[in-house]
Amino acid sequence: MNFLLQLIIDGAFAATASLGFGMVFNVPKHTLKYCAMGGAIVYSLRTIFLHFNFGIEISTFLASAVIGIIALYWSRKYKIPRPVYTVASIIPILPGTYAFGAMTTLIDINRFGASIELIESFTHNGLKAIAVLIAITFGLVLPSLY
């Protein structure tokens, strides 16, 4: 029960973030609810996959593929381009923590000099961020190919 409650709360915050970015990207008003719904869906799905011990990359890919399929349906139904839904929806799953960790480690390398631990941390965080971005890209692109 605790996991379900936390999932609902996190989904609501993800929907709020997607809604905000939808407003920033100036999407049509009638699509804002779908952007928010997409953000909640994609974040909740990724959290569920992570809970079942999928890796972050696979979880992100699967969640992105699902929102890609849903956005493809919405775009055909409402005659709105697919990126209107997908761009705002994927905002909650962007790898900000890993990118931030890579950049702060890079600053530490510049400030204190290179050490094995810092280089390892930079490489790990940077490659993890790139892998998650690639997973998002393929997850969004593959549904539109069929």
Predicted regions and their residues:
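Alpha-helical transmembrane segments and their membrane-interface boundaries
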Residues: 1-69, 80-82, 105-146
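Short glycine- and Lys/Arg-enriched binding-loop motifs that mark or flank ligand-binding interfaces
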Residues: 35, 85, 92
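Juxtamembrane helix-break-helix junctions at the cytosolic face
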Residues: 75-77
